[in-house]
Amino acid sequence: MLAFNFFGATEGGLFDINATLPLMAIQVVALTYILNSLFFKPVGNVVEKREKFVSNNIIEAKNKLSEVKKLEADLLTQLQSARTEAQRIVSEAENESDKLYKEALELANNEANASKEKARLEIESQTSAARDQLSKQADDLSELIVNRLILEK
């Protein structure tokens, strides 16, 4: 008792060493064991399951993201090839349209030239026929005049 008073501790204080100290130690160990088996292990298992679930979902999301990126790249490639094909088709259609236009224009010009030439030949023919007729009428008229003059004398 003198030793405890020497350090300033009184009986029944915080640092009393008696039979309650080992009992308290056993209670702490028992409480730790009970809490560990009844609370911490199930909570730890739930946390581990949740971590596995989250980890699996993250891995699955990464896989899906990589698949989406691959599909996006494929679709962009297909889109680019479709655009190129569309441009090629439009270009071919424009070329074909120009070709048909030029052919139609050439055909129309040829028909117009043929029609113009036919009209020119017809006009020349009619002009020649009119000259011949006029020449014949002039000959007939001059013969008539000559015959009248001869008959009058």
From Swiss-Prot:
Its main location: membrane. One of its GO terms (molecular function) is proton-transporting ATP synthase activity, rotational mechanism. Keywords: ATP synthesis, CF(0), Hydrogen ion transport, Ion transport, Membrane, Thylakoid, Transmembrane, Transmembrane helix, Transport. The keyword Transmembrane helix applies. It is a single-pass membrane protein. F(1)F(0) ATP synthase produces ATP from ADP in the presence of a proton or sodium gradient. F-type ATPases consist of two structural domains, F(1) containing the extramembraneous catalytic core and F(0) containing the membrane proton channel, linked together by a central stalk and a peripheral stalk. During catalysis, ATP synthesis in the catalytic domain of F(1) is coupled via a rotary mechanism of the central stalk subunits to proton translocation. Component of the F(0) channel, it forms part of the peripheral stalk, linking F(1) to F(0). The b'-subunit is a diverged and duplicated form of b found in plants and photosynthetic bacteria. It comes from the Bacteria. Belongs to the ATPase B chain family. It holds the Pfam family ATP-synt_B. F-type ATPases have 2 components, F(1) - the catalytic core - and F(0) - the membrane proton channel. F(1) has five subunits: alpha(3), beta(3), gamma(1), delta(1), epsilon(1). F(0) has four main subunits: a(1), b(1), b'(1) and c(10-14). The alpha and beta chains form an alternating ring which encloses part of the gamma chain. F(1) is attached to F(0) by a central stalk formed by the gamma and epsilon chains, while a peripheral stalk is formed by the delta, b and b' chains. It is found in: Cellular thylakoid membrane. This is ATP synthase subunit b'. The chain crosses the membrane at residues 23-40. The lineage of its organism: Bacteria, Bacillati, Cyanobacteriota, Cyanophyceae, Synechococcales. The gene is atpF2. GO terms for cellular component: plasma membrane-derived thylakoid membrane; proton-transporting ATP synthase complex.
